[in-house]
Amino acid sequence: MINRKAIGYITANYSSTYGSVLLKDRPIASVPFLGRYRLIDFPLSNMMNAGIKTVGVVMPGNYRSLIDHVGSGKDWGLDRKKGGLFMVPGNAYGTTKGGMRFLLRDIISNKTLFQRSDKPYVVMMGTNIIFNMDLNTIIDAHENSGAQMTVVYCKATRNVDDETKLEINENGRLTGVSAGVVYGDNASMDCCIVNRETLLEIIDHYQAADYLDLLEALQATLATSTCAVTSTRARSWACLARSRCIAAAWTCSTRP
């Protein structure tokens, strides 16, 4: 199955605000999980299961562990002549700046990836949250909403400073964005669907403010009501519950 509606964009150039010896020389995207997996396997697998065949991965300065694990993308069907896996440049400071998942500077630097696509949508994902989700359902919901962007969220189960709070009205429209969540808040899952043309407009508009994150730019856009943004709540089963269920949904690299 080939998804003819969307391309993928994964940000792998940031670390965690929580200190760990595992993060000393690597981004969070290449942190091991249950032995054989790395955290980047999960967004790649979600995109593979949705039939997305063009994926750009934003690389950090300390990219060796990612290259060693992902390779050519063969394990996700991304070693292709048309489309495939693209390792695109990222900004080194993005590896440690808390709360930043979709830096505009990275998006602007990789404008060509979006310009060359003939797909109408871009699926953007981070690598710090593990979940299994049918992205085709989210893409269809976005298409039916008529919004320029759809943000996936869940209810926060704890207080976290390094996550993004979403304010959502009774119609499911996003009305505000802020840093930090407490229990029960609407927490972004660092997954969104955006119209490709809208993303290109954002790139052109924010050339001089490329230090912002996409959601920070979104906050300014909401204030001027120039962009319609809807939201989709992730069902509770979308998050990891049992390790024995992983093999059916997720693919890991066969490389060492």
What are these regions (language model features)?
Residues R64-M87:
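Acidic donor-binding segment of Leloir-type glycosyltransferases
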Residues L39-L44:
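Short, well-formed alpha-helical segments that are part of the catalytic scaffolds
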Residues G84-K165:
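Conserved beta-loop-beta/alpha segment of the NTase-like Rossmann-fold superfamily
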Residues G73-D75, L166-N171:
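Short, hinge-like loop/turn segments at secondary-structure boundaries
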Residues T54-P60, V151-Y153:
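Short internal beta-strands
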Residues I139, N169-P256:
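Catalytic-core segments of class I nucleotidyltransferases/pyrophosphorylases
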Residues M1-L34, S45, A50-I52:
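N-terminal nucleotide-binding beta1-loop-alpha1 segment
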Residues R36-Y37, M48-G51, N62, H69:
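Extended, compositionally biased accessory segments flanking or bridging domains
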